[in-house]
Amino acid sequence: MLLKGGHVIDGKNHINAVRDVAVADGRIAAVSPDIPAAKAAKVVDVSGLYVTPGLVDMHAHVYAGTGQRGAYCGDNSVYPDGFTFRTGVTTVVDAGSSGWRNFPDFKDRVIDRSHTRVLAFLNIVGAGMAGKVEQDVEQMDPKAAAEQAMRYRDIIVGIKTAHYAGPEWTAVERAVEAGTLANIPVMVDFGTFRPERPFQDLVLKKLRPGDIYTHMYLSWVPMLDDSGRVLPYLFEARRRGVIFDVGHGGGSFLFRQAVPAMRQGFGPDSISTDLHIGSMNAGMKDMLNVMSKFLNMGMPLDEVILRSTWTPAREIKHEELGNLSVGAAADVAVLRVEEGHFGFVDTYGARLRGTRKLECELTVRNGRVVWDLNGITREDWDKLGKYLAQGDGKWDGTLGAEIRRRK
């Protein structure tokens, strides 16, 4: 397949120009200014569209199907495939829904059955995000978490701590200990902000370079002084290597934090959704909606794409993802920038007006088309030869019958 005439944005390879992208055997075969159409079995005209690596959503909750009510290792999570491909996402990272005890069930129930690539931060709590148990420090076992992470090193990208309400640093310290043992980063949702454990100490003292603070524009984060200036300690934390992730979610993104911070140069290292049942139909909506917010807050498109592809891939130490290098898995998003009058809502119900909005035209996962909004990879019905339909004795109810007949 040849994606021809699109504007390629690939941060790893420093491409921001019109290029053709050739896909063969599930891999990127070539990226070049003009690849002859005669070489391709199928040519897809993507002129006027943006061709990017498949998006990497570094914070989602997809441990669905367990039946646990009110839990992110259960009913609060969503199955990934219904939310990813339609927005150009080919990789999601579950942010600690499962813990070191129930990760094998998550792998069997969701990861191994999904067409989306699913990676995971492993919760320091053995039962994962299962409600009250997240406060049980006896469940926070660094050694068990590290052992599980090393056992599934190809899937588990880091350790997660979240929702802890106690005054002690126990959750953070044990997560960091597990991360050190397994040589992987830690992602922190700081839970209830307590004066006994100041946020400044989290990002200046407790987290290591390469560790991730998510929900960076949460209202509780001490971000602005009385005159609206970004507090200097945040820039200091970034200089020492702490990563700041969006993690929009259903209650963790405030324009009154994000807009002033963006204007003063404190934007996100990575853009992510915190997808779950409480965010999917609210202000967050989906990955492209979150990316569009940053586009309308003044972040250039190539930077928006970078922070949704190559940057998160590096943060989780999966540098085979988030790029269109020759030989890489052919995970590709083809995006359109719609021009018009749009509104974007934060988690407190406040609106930002904007003039540009991202929409996904096409998603390719491992070389296979998995989303095609307007049928740009298809032939017009009246130009096809005879094909089977309902009522034909050979029709089996799927397109597979026609494909087999043609072969």
Question: What residues fall within each predicted segment?
Answer:
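Short, acidic/polar
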Residues: C73-F83, V137-A149, E196-V203
